[in-house]
Curated annotation (Swiss-Prot):
GO biological process: arginine biosynthetic process via ornithine; L-arginine biosynthetic process
Entries under PROSITE patterns matching the protein: FUMARATE_LYASES
Entry-linked HAMAP family: Arg_succ_lyase
Recorded metabolic or biological pathway in which this protein acts: Amino-acid biosynthesis; L-arginine biosynthesis; L-arginine from L-ornithine and carbamoyl phosphate: step 3/3
GO cellular component terms, A-Z: cytosol
Protein name: Argininosuccinate lyase
Keyword set includes Lyase: yes
UniProt similarity note: Belongs to the lyase 1 family. Argininosuccinate lyase subfamily.
GO molecular function: argininosuccinate lyase activity
Xref: Pfam families: ASL_C2, Lyase_1
Source organism per UniProt: Bartonella bacilliformis (strain ATCC 35685 / KC583 / Herrer 020/F12,63)
Length: 466
């Protein structure tokens, strides 16, 4: 049977002529939705089992349908299946092949089902599986960051605001900041999985069906928590895809921030880290170059996730209930988003696991830029009882004096300090080191090594069940 006749047979009973060539061109989605073949077959197998259980079809017909679907799955996975654009999508391609294999019995499979709920369940299954893989990749990256944080709980480096040296911190503390970000990403992904874990199968076109189906049976068979509660919403909803892309875009944004730091830190101007050969490239003209291309691509791919989210939001904006063909455009945005997020997470995992930390360069930079100025102000508050604003002013004058003399704060003499305030005494020099500065920041969540290790311990335990 030819493709155009099959296509017409599926839905064309009231049409006198076939579609125009350009209609077939714009209507076909098989080039991309063939990714859903496994989910489509799983959905059909569970639907067929339910139809047999409820005696809507005979057990004999059910066995023929199962056998045919299993053959089709084998053909697709071995590359012998021929996809036809004339048959529009993965659902009709599989149904047409099933008709060729088992004859008219194949037509019974679509009893009490529409392509509207069929594609909705296929897509939910696919997105749920993708989200679970992303969640695992996030956990793996967090574990790698935790290992780095534990190794470098006391490795000194400068902390920045406005990309200017602010206060000394530790590299471990910095890594833990990203653990927190990715922890939120993981939580959002788990929440999205929980919300999408309802089966739309059985909603039919939009109004449900008059056949005595068991939606709870198919939901359970497909691993869903329960069936969706409103048949119109079931086929209209793409929130699950949007929520996944939203969580993915946030994750990609966090990855891009870490990528930017890696790009800066690996530059000759910072020299904080060295990227491995595996995640660097060279220049076609400048032989000395080590370009952080992997990190740059991770940084850029955040734009792909943002574009996917904005694209699907725009497709769905203003659509009346229930299903509209516009919704066919949902899949490419999600497929592209998943591909680029998976690549970004895998690349960042490799970058973090392979990079070398230059402790000496970090420590030297941590002591530059008068990073311990805040410690001087805090000492004036604690030891001299000064209001913080007055202590801030005194410290600012101390920095100006040190800049004038081209020296560090701890190189100022006691006499020079006492010109700023007569009560300053020799004990002030005890706090004017980056080591003391970091050790003193032991408030909950702070940069002190003891606090960093506490944060590491918390997340190690939390990730066991996350």
């Amino acid at each position: 049977m030819t493709g155009d006749k099959l296509s017409n047979q599926m839905w064309g009973g009231r049409f006198a002529a076939g579609p125009a060539a350009i209609m077939e061109e714009i209507n076909a989605s098989i080039d991309f939705d063939q990714k859903l073949y496994r989910q489509d077959i799983e959905g059909s197998l569970s639907h067929a089992a339910m139809l047999a259980q409820t005696k809507i079809i005979s057990h004999s017909d059910y066995e023929k349908i199962v056998h045919g679907l299993q053959l089709i799955r084998q053909e697709i996975e071995t590359g012998s299946f021929t996809f036809s654009r004339k048959l529009e999508d993965i659902h009709m391609n599989i149904e047409a092949r099933l008709s060729e294999l088992i004859g008219p019995v194949a037509g019974r499979l679509h009893t009490a089902r529409s392509r509207n709920d069929q594609v909705a369940v296929d897509f939910r299954l696919w997105v749920r599986e993708a989200a679970q893989k992303i969640a695992q990749a996030l956990k793996d990256l967090m574990e790698q960051l935790l290992m780095r944080a534990e190794q470098h709980a006391d490795t000194l480096m400068p902390g920045f605001t406005h990309l200017q040296t602010a206060q000394p911190v530790t590299f471990g503390h910095y890594m833990m900041a990203y653990v927190e970000m990715f922890g939120r990403d993981l939580s959002r992904m788990r929440d999205a999985i929980e919300r999408m874990n309802e089966s739309p199968l059985g909603a039919a076109a939009l109004a449900g069906t008059g056949f005595p189906i068991d939606r709870f049976m198919t939901a359970q068979a497909l691993g869903f928590r329960e069936p969706t509660r409103n048949s119109i919403d079931s086929v209209s909803d793409r929130d699950f895809a949007l929520e996944f892309l939203s969580a993915g875009a946030l994750c990609a944004m966090h990855l891009s921030r870490l990528a930017e730091e890696i790009i800066l830190w690996s530059s000759a101007q910072f020299h904080f880290i060295r990227l491995s050969d595996a995640f660097s490239t060279g220049s076609s003209i400048m032989p000395q170059k080590r370009n952080p291309d992997a990190a740059e691509l991770v940084r850029a791919k955040a734009g792909r996730l943002n574009a996917a989210l904005m694209g699907l939001l725009t497709v769905m904006k203003g659509l009346p209930l229930a299903y509209s063909k516009d919704m066919q455009e949902d899949k490419e945005y999600v497929f592209d988003g998943v591909l680029n997020l998976e690549l970004s997470l895998a690349a960042m995992m490799g970058i973090i696991s392979d990079l070398e930390v230059n402790k000496e360069a970090m420590k030297q930079a941590a002591g530059s830029g008068y990073a311990i100025a805040t410690d001087l102000a805090d000492w004036c508050v604690r030891e001299l009882g000064l209001p913080f604003r007055e202590a801030h002013h005194i410290t600012g004058r101390a920095v100006a004096l040190a800049e004038q003399k081209k020296c560090s704060l701890d190189e100022l003499s006691l006499d020079e300090f006492q010109t700023l305030h007569p009560d300053i005494n020799a004990a002030v020099f005890d706090v004017l080191t980056i080591e003391k500065s970091v050790e003193s920041r032991n408030s909950f969540g702070g940069t002190a090594p003891s606090e960093v290790l506490r944060q590491v311990a918390y997340w190690k335990q939390h990730l066991v069940t996350a």
